[in-house]
């Protein structure tokens, strides 16, 4: 059976399906499938080539899942407004998948990851212009909070949404979604099954916080408020 599958943003393909699944049984509201989604992401994250020295372990986040569900239920094949994709102070990224028939969540996540076929670490999309953003979000080292949801939009349309916090796909860094090196090289004392478990709870407001922190030694309240990750997270993954 041929299933029409679309992955936001620009990819549209016809793909042979291995068979339909019961949509209700694949609901992301069920605890077993939440575990399936998280485990699939973590399995893919620990299998990246080249290996990653700073890849964080993902965990389920109910707030991100609620945000994903609200958007999935609107059955709009477009990204949700960025201001609706937040968990606390964290801004979240988003992957979207649409199919003409229900898919197992592991298959949805694998479809996003498979964009790796057109990705070269350190270079980016190859050939240039290829869609790789779903893959890079799945393996973005810093994204460690995950929430997903799905919706049956009609008899021929199923929408799957995952949100990732903090957001990946930072401009200028797409070609290096993680730091290559020995597995868990940046978290030797906080490594579980090849993934780091020590995320920094803060997020810097600026990309040049390292330079600012060196200049001020984090002694001003302004620097502490704008560069809290750099100032306070010395052993955690930033």
Curated annotation (Swiss-Prot):
Residues 38-164 form the SCP domain. The keyword Disulfide bond applies. Keywords: Calcium channel impairing toxin, Disulfide bond, Ion channel impairing toxin, Neurotoxin, Secreted, Signal, Toxin. Transmembrane segments: none annotated. CDD domains: CAP_CRISP. Disulfide bonds join 75-153, 92-165, 148-162, 184-191, 187-196, 200-233, 209-227, 218-231. Expressed by the venom gland. Residues 200-233 form the ShKT domain. GO terms for molecular function: calcium channel regulator activity; toxin activity. One of its GO terms (cellular component) is extracellular region. Belongs to the CRISP family. Blocks olfactory (CNGA2) and retinal (CNGA1) CNG channel currents. Does not affect neither depolarization- nor caffeine-induced contraction of smooth muscle. This is Cysteine-rich venom protein. It comes from Drysdalia coronoides.
């Amino acid at each position: 059976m041929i299933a029409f599958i679309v992955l936001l943003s620009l990819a549209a393909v016809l793909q042979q399906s291995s068979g339909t699944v019961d949509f209700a049984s694949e609901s992301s509201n069920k605890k077993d499938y939440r575990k399936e989604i998280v485990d699939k992401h973590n399995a893919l994250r620990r299998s990246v080539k080249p290996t990653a020295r700073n890849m964080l372990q993902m965990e389920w986040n109910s707030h991100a899942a609620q945000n994903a569900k609200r958007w999935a239920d609107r059955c709009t094949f477009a990204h949700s407004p960025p201001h609706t994709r937040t968990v606390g102070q964290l801004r979240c990224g988003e992957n979207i998948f649409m199919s003409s028939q229900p898919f197992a969540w592991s298959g949805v996540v694998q479809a996003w990851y498979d964009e790796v076929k057109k990705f070269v670490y350190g270079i980016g999309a190859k050939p240039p212009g290829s869609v790789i953003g779903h893959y890079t979000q799945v393996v973005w080292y810093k994204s460690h909070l995950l929430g997903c949801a799905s919706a049956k939009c009609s008899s021929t349309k199923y929408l799957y949404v995952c949100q990732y916090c903090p957001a990946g796909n930072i401009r200028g860094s797409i070609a290096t979604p993680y730091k290559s090196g020995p597995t868990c090289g940046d978290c030797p004392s906080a490594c579980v099954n090849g993934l780091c478990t020590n995320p920094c709870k803060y997020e810097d407001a600026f990309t040049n916080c390292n330079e600012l922190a060196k200049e001020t030694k984090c002694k001003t309240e302004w620097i502490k408020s704008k560069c809290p990750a750099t100032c306070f997270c010395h052993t955690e993954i930033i």
